[in-house]
UniProtKB/Swiss-Prot annotation:
Entry's family note: Belongs to the TACO1 family.
Protein localization: Cytoplasm
Transcription is among the record's keywords: yes
Region called Disordered, residue ranges: 1-21
Keyword Nucleus: no
Domain of life: Bacteria
One MF annotation (Gene Ontology) recorded for this entry: DNA binding
Name of protein: Probable transcriptional regulatory protein Ajs_1898
GO BP terms in the entry: regulation of DNA-templated transcription
Amino acid sequence: MAGHSKWANIQHRKGRQDEKRGKIWTRIIREITVAARTGGGDPSANPRLRLAIDKAKAANMPADRIKYNIDKASGTLEGVSYEEIRYEGYGIGGAAIIVDTMTDNRVRTVAEVRHAFSKYGGNMGTEGSVAFQFKNVGQIIFAPGTSEDKVMEVALEAGAEDVITDDEGAIEVLTAPGDFEAVRDALGAAGLQPEVAEVTMRPENTIALEGDDVARMQKLLDMIEDLDDVQEVYHNAEL
């Protein structure tokens, strides 16, 4: 199945992550902390913690640091308590934006997120104002040049819902959140290594931006992503 090109967006995101690895680690540590506190410190019995550990390994976080943060969150050591808060709003051209945060000070966080929205012409919405435009899915993306036939065969056999190839040849595998790990592991066992593998909020439809609106939207997204309390940013703009 064909789809819009998203390869440039992936490369932009990976480039920014490489530039700020320390911040990526901070976000992952927060995710490990919340996952371990809510579901326990045993990864085999805590899917959310398993995914957080996978993110940590992908970001080259040392194993002893991963273990330390799991132990800390599980109650062995004293730590900071984080609250998960989701904000929703609109960016340039009415594009929908979801901002997931983990914070120890919700007053600070909402002020910073609201400021980022307003600085570049966006605006905060109410709870539920844009979330209905997204679907929670497992997403596994392969670089252009990967065998589409092989990905499709393995993914669908393992329980994937859809396989989409974009205009540049990048291949996107979509799964139900509960099937994500099984599909990802089956693809890995077949020698297929993805560029992206995560459970995410995927837009049901996208909004095309043109001219200066593209740069303005990217600046808005970058500013939100750079906020200390922000974990993930989802949007439906074509950039």
